[in-house]
Regions:
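Vicinal oxygen chelate
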Residues: 3-9, 79-86, 91, 146-193, ...
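N-terminal secretory signal peptides
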Residues: 1-17, 21, 28-30, 41-42
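Core segments of cupin and vicinal oxygen chelate
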Residues: 16, 25-31, 77-124, 179, ...
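N-terminal beta-strand motif that seeds the catalytic metal site of vicinal oxygen chelate
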Residues: 6-14, 44-83, 113, 150-157, ...
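Conserved short beta-strand elements that form part of the metal-binding/catalytic scaffold
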Residues: 43-62, 96-148, 159, 196-204, ...
Length: 366
């Protein structure tokens, strides 16, 4: 789904947009975009093949490292109220809290990934008000900002050798910053948009060993589900130049490039999951030629996690029973009971768009 439409539904889910306003805004959006815009990508229908939707991939920024990504070590997320967010993920997604030191909580995503939640998030000022109903995109009306931002991710690579990794990064024009503690070894670098990329020695044998028995100060917001998170369905990664970013991660971390749709590229992160690297982090496309280009930026618009035994009515019922929204998303492929792609979006206490899907390693290409 395009960023503008995702934001519209996000406002509706949070109660900041009435049903009438949503329908009015959707009428505007549909007039501006083909129906295919409701699915992932912006270059379907009549826009396919236009200059704005050129599917030619970018050249690689440097010689490939030959590394393979073998682990989602952890996501890094800053929120306004981290104990509340941690308690929510623990109850809804059944992620175990490994630790909470009063400044951040570390959670296990199933037995294959991690999440570090930090406090201290300061929301940016809202955009100027407008008489039009909130459109959720450039030039739209007032929209309260999220109180959460995923601002980094850490990936474990195979055949770790700290000196060789540092040399490989420097010879490719990157500036690695070591971040080590105990058996944990890593380097931070910046991607083309300045996003914090951490590369580590993490693998399934040296991470998340032993039971996670931590607690956070916030109470559980509702009864815990029995869901098991088994797959990283996709990260929606909105960047300034998706072609450059896709080429960067392909060359550096070995992520397999998908078909360039003209506005995004869905890449495979080994046997961990997928990432949709998409247009949306700037670019100043509508500005005058003389205008100063904006600072490049990247953001995770949403993250979709696959759970075991996904059954549409049961999942929706669990969300509704807990007072949570459940916005259906089949990627434009029809009824959720028969579509090949099945998922629901909901919103975390700090306002992040969490997607829960039926996608697993076994059906990732369905």
């Amino acid at each position: 789904m395009s960023i503008e439409l995702t934001n519209l539904f996000d406002e509706f889910d949070r109660g900041r947009l009435s049903r009438r306003q949503l329908l009015q805004a959707l009428g505007i959006a549909v007039a501006l975009r083909p129906a295919a815009a409701f699915a992932q990508g912006q270059c379907g229908g009549a826009r396919a093949g236009t200059p704005e939707c050129d599917p030619t991939p970018a050249k690689l920024p440097f010689e490939p490292t030959g590394w393979n990504t073998v682990l989602l070590d952890h996501f890094s997320c800053q929120v306004a109220d981290y104990p509340k967010e941690a308690a929510y993920y623990a109850a809804l997604m059944n992620w175990k809290i490994r630790s909470d030191d009063g400044k951040q909580a570390v959670l296990d995503i199933g037995d294959w990934g991690g999440l570090v939640l930090r406090g201290g998030f300061q929301a940016p000022p809202p955009p100027p008000a407008s008489d039009a109903p909130p459109a959720g995109g450039r030039g739209g009306g007032p929209r309260a900002p999220r109180n959460a931002a995923f601002d980094g991710f850490c990936w474990g690579i195979d055949a770790w050798d700290a000196k060789k990794v540092e040399t490989a990064l420097r010879t490719r024009g990157l500036t690695p910053v070591a971040d080590n503690h105990g058996d944990f070894q890593s380097f931070h670098v910046k991607d083309p948009d300045g996003f914090d990329l951490q590369i580590s020695n993490g693998n399934r044998k040296n991470r998340r060993q032993g039971p996670a028995t931590g607690q956070t100060t916030a109470p559980a917001p509702f009864e815990t589900t029995s869901w098991k998170t088994v797959w990283l369905d996709h990260i929606s990664f909105e960047v300034s130049n998706y072609k450059e970013t896709a080429a960067f991660y392909h060359a550096l971390l070995g992520w397999k490039l998908g078909t360039d749709e003209g506005s995004q590229n869905q890449c495979e992160i080994g046997d961990i999951g997928d990432i949709i690297i998409r247009r949306g982090g700037g670019g100043n496309r509508s500005a005058a030629p003389s205008a100063r280009p904006p600072a490049r930026r990247a953001a995770m618009g949403h993250i979709s996690f696959g759970i075991a035994g996904f059954e549409p009515d049961a999942v929706k019922g669990e969300l509704t029973r807990r007072g949570l929204t459940a916005r259906e998303d089949t990627g434009g492929r029809g009824d959720i009971h028969t579509a090949s792609y099945k998922s629901y979006h909901t919103t975390t206490p700090n306002g992040f768009d969490l997607q829960i899907s039926a996608t697993t390693k076994a059906n990732r290409w369905a």
